[in-house]
Amino acid sequence: MSLTLAIYGKGGIGKSTTSSNLSAALALKGAKVLQIGCDPKHDSTFALTGTLQPTVIDVLTEVDFHHEEVSVEDVVHTGFAGVDTLESGGPPAGSGCGGYVVGETVKLLHEFGLYDKYDVIVFDVLGDVVCGGFSAPLNYADYGIIIACNDFDSIFAANRLCLAIKQKSARYRVELAGIIANRVDYELGGGTTLLEQFAETVGTRIIGRVPYHDLIRRSRLMGKTLFEMEGPGKEECTAPFLEMAEELLNRPRSTVPKPLGDREIFNVIGGWR
C-alpha cells in the first residue's frame, strides 16, 4: 500500500512549491511518486512539469462524466525525476463545489488502481479549507502535514487544521506527522520561535525548515524544482527536502494533535514572543 501524505496550510503559504520539491526529493530517494493537486487553480504541479496540465474536471466534462471513457494517460502526466502528476481542478469561479471535484478525483484513482502503483502519493490540498470535499484526502492519508510560517495567521490556520486531523483520526488512520516551517528568516522573521511554541502546545513538532530564499521564488516563476536550479543557496534550499523525504520514507513519529480553541489561541499567541 502506498504511503499517502495530505499537505495543508494557509492560502499563499507556499504549499504547491513545497509539495513539489518534497515529491521531487522523495523520487530522488528512489520512490515512485504521484502528486495530486487539489485546487481549482490547478497549478500544484507546475514546478514539476513546467506547464499547467489538463485537470480531471476538464477531462470528465469533455466525456460528460463517463468515467469509463477516461484513461490514465488523459489525466496523469510525468514530470521531473519521474514524478507522476495529476490536477483535480475545480468548477468555474463562483459556481459549484470544489470539494466535489476532489471526491471525483479520489474515485478515479481507485478505478485506475493507482494506489497500488506508487510508493508515495502526495495530496496538495487547497488552502486552510477543511470542508467535506477538501478534507477527503485525510480519509486516505497515513499522515497529514501542515505548512506554516512564523506568524499569527499561519499559526491560526495550522490550529484549525490540527482540529480537522484530530477529528478525522477518530475514524481513519491519519495522524499528524508534523509542521514544515516555510520561509524561515532568522534575521527579520523571528526564525521559528512562534512555530516551535505552537508545535509543543498542540503536541507535534517541526519536521523541516525551508529558508526564505530568492532561489525558491525564481524556481516557482520558472516552473522548475529547486533541484533543477543553479546558483548560490541551492544546497541550503534542497537539503531540508532531502532530509524530510528520508524521514517520511522511514515512517516518521506522528501524533494526534491537541488543538486549542479559537478564542484560546488568540490569547495564547499574544503571549508568545
Curated annotation (Swiss-Prot):
Enzyme class (EC, first level): oxidoreductase
EC identifiers of the protein: 1.3.7.7
Cofactor note: Binds 1 [4Fe-4S] cluster per dimer.
Cofactor: [4Fe-4S] cluster
Source domain of life: Bacteria
Secretion signal, residue range per the UniProt entry: none
Claim: Secreted is one of the keywords in the record: no
Pathways per UniProt: Porphyrin-containing compound metabolism; bacteriochlorophyll biosynthesis (light-independent)
One function term, GO molecular function aspect: ATP binding
Keyword Magnesium: yes
Catalyzed reactions: chlorophyllide a + oxidized 2[4Fe-4S]-[ferredoxin] + 2 ADP + 2 phosphate = protochlorophyllide a + reduced 2[4Fe-4S]-[ferredoxin] + 2 ATP + 2 H2O
Family matches, as Pfam families: Fer4_NifH (PF00142)
InterPro entries assigned: NifH/chlL_CS, NifH/frxC, P-loop_NTPase, Protochlorophyllide_ATP-bd
Positions that bind Mg(2+): 16
Residues annotated for [4Fe-4S] cluster binding in this entry: 97, 131
GO BP terms: light-independent bacteriochlorophyll biosynthetic process; photosynthesis, dark reaction
Residues that bind ATP: 12-17, 41, 182-183
UniProtKB keywords: 4Fe-4S, ATP-binding, Bacteriochlorophyll biosynthesis, Chlorophyll biosynthesis, Iron, Iron-sulfur, Magnesium, Metal-binding, Nucleotide-binding, Oxidoreductase, Photosynthesis
UniProt family annotation: Belongs to the NifH/BchL/ChlL family.
Quaternary structure (record): Homodimer. Protochlorophyllide reductase is composed of three subunits; BchL, BchN and BchB.
Function: Component of the dark-operative protochlorophyllide reductase (DPOR) that uses Mg-ATP and reduced ferredoxin to reduce ring D of protochlorophyllide (Pchlide) to form chlorophyllide a (Chlide). This reaction is light-independent. The L component serves as a unique electron donor to the NB-component of the complex, and binds Mg-ATP.
Protein name as annotated: Light-independent protochlorophyllide reductase iron-sulfur ATP-binding protein
Organism for this UniProt entry: Roseiflexus sp. (strain RS-1)
